[in-house]
Amino acid sequence: MADMTRVDFHTNVPDKLAYACRLARKAYMAGNKIVVLAGNSAQLDAMNAAMWTLSPTDFVPHVLAGDPLAAQTPIVLTDSEEVELPHHDILVNVSQLPPENYAQFQRVFEIVSTDEQDAQAGRQRFLHYRKLNLQPTHFVAGKS
């Protein structure tokens, strides 16, 4: 099943959380169910806040993993792979580590910011996927 997972790297992203919010909204509007993986509780809280303030006109339905409504809510936010995740369409990774459970998802988006430390972690994740015989694609934000 792992070889069926498509991995897309989006690099050179100026605001990682805002970008992840827009990507999740776009995927939701296309009918997908999404899990957003944060690196820690502080990043998870920031991601949750960013979802609420994404747009004054759009509501992006989301809950934290473990919420009783998680299975019915199209976007689930988590900072742990240990919790039960109800969705398996798309994983948006904003953490600096490769997700161990990537193979549960049809598609993984790796979001890499312009920060040098984050870019270095992104390169390590790219190599990690290559070692798993996956062929990640690379999209540079801001370039067409």
Write out the residue ranges for each language-model feature:
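Trafficking entry modules
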Residues: R107-D118
